[in-house]
A protein has these predicted regions:
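PRPP-dependent phosphoribosyltransferase catalytic core
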Residues: 3-14, 61-187
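Short, glycine/charge-rich flexible loops or terminal/linker lids adjacent to PRPP-binding catalytic cores
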Residues: 4-45, 54-61
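Generic enzyme active-site microenvironment
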Residues: 48-49
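Short acidic/polar capping segments at secondary-structure boundaries
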Residues: 52-54, 83-84
């Protein structure tokens, strides 16, 4: 999970100050588990911020690490820009509230009748085979998420034709939306 202080600073400055509940509260922006541990006695609410939640596995792993530091899950909240419906359900089933601007269904399974969905799933698996995606479990995205989203670093919950890069016929194939994080703005 990525704690995004620049987004949170904007959120704090423009939104949180409008609410009476925050007038007398100290808002800390932290990026490390060590900082969470350092201030754990003061934490009344811990807000985790991420750009995307797919299956929920990464967020649940982060929550588990935070719980190991002595923070109870009841005070943890998560805010994300985009979430897969199945990921939201997994997080909320665990007992953590998740708020998102956009909730995404599975691109095929949740948008077609069973017969049409099965055909389209086979087509998508065929595309993944042609791309020579090595891990068959990723043919429909991680945990069969069937995601249709891209960010600076495209999540592996999306269909592999978005992000998969490999060699085909001895030539390197570039993805339209790679998972590599080798291009960015330095601070």
């Amino acid at each position: 999970i990525l704690f995004l202080p620049y987004i949170f600073l904007l959120f704090q400055a423009t939104f949180m100050r409008r609410f009476e509940e925050f007038h007398d509260k100290r808002v800390r922006i932290v990026e490390t588990f060590e900082a969470i541990e350092k201030y754990k006695e003061e934490i009344e609410c811990l807000i985790l911020i991420d750009d995307y939640v797919g299956s929920g596995d990464t967020l649940l792993g982060c929550i588990n690490l935070i719980e190991e530091k002595g923070i109870k899950k009841e005070i943890i909240k998560s805010i994300t820009l985009v979430v897969q419906k199945s990921g939201k359900e997994a997080i909320e089933k665990y007992g953590v509230d998740l708020y998102s601007a956009i909730i995404r269904n599975k691109a095929i399974t949740d948008n077609y009748n069973k017969e049409d969905a099965e055909k389209k799933i086979q087509q998508m698996e065929g595309i993944s085979k042609k791309l020579k995606v090595k891990n068959k479990s990723l043919y429909l995205g991680y945990k069969k998420s069937e995601g249709l989203v891209t960010m600076i670093k495209t999540p592996n919950n999306t269909f592999p034709f978005y992000w998969y890069e490999g060699k085909r016929d001895g030539k390197f194939m570039m993805a339209p939306f790679p998972r590599r994080n080798n291009v960015g703005v330095d601070e």
